[in-house]
Amino acid sequence: MRNWKVVVITPENPFDGETEQIKKVIACGIFRLHLRHPKADEQTMRRILNGLSADERGKIVLHDHYNLVDEYNLGGAHLNGRHPELASVCSSRSCHSLAEVVASTGMRYCFLSPIFDSISKSGYASNFSDDVLRQAKKDGIINERVIALGGITVGKVQQVKEYGFGGVAILGSAWKDGIAQLDIIKQMME
C-alpha cells in the first residue's frame, strides 16, 4: 500500500494525563495528532503543548487557537465549521461532500466524513454509499490526500483502502475513558 496515514483526533474535552497519552500515541508512529478541544482556552492548549518535545509538536495539528501553530512550530491548522476561513498555517480541512474534497486542492490533506456510522457521535450516520465511494475513486476524487473519518474500526480498514483513501482518522476507536487504545492504533497502521 502507498504511504498509509493514521491520524488520531483527541476527545473533545481535555483530560487528566492527556499530554502523556498524546506522547504514547505519537510514539506509535502516527502521521498526525489533531488536538481538537473546541471549548478549551489558550492557556489549556499551551499547557498541553509545553509538555511535548519539538519533534512531538511537529506532529500536532490544531483545530483552534491557530496563533499557536507558528509559535510552537506545529504540524499545521485544520479548517472546520468553527473556523472555515483559510488560515495561512492551514494544512487540512474537514469535508462532508465530494464537492468539498474537490474544492480543497490547496490542502495537504482533507478528511471526508462520515464514511461509516460514527462511533463517537450518536446518530451521526454514514453519508456515502459503497457505489458512490467506488465511483469517487475511479474519478480520482478519493486519493492519497483524502483521509476517511467516521466509524473507522480495525475491521473496516481494508475496505477503506479498497475505496482508495490515503489513510484513516480515528477518534472513537482511539480513546476509552481518557486512555489511548495503542493496540488499536497500531493495528490501523498495518
Which role does the model predict for each range below?
Residues M1-H78, R82-L86, C90-Y109, Q135-K138, ...:
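Conserved N-terminal beta1-alpha1 strand-loop-helix module at the mouth
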Residues F128-Q135:
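Glycine-rich S-adenosyl-L-methionine
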Residues R108-F116:
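Non-cysteine beta-strand/loop elements that form the S-adenosyl-L-methionine
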Residues F116-S122:
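A short acidic, helix-capping loop that chelates divalent metal ions and anchors anionic groups
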Residues A125:
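Recognition helix of helix-turn-helix/homeodomain-like DNA-binding domains
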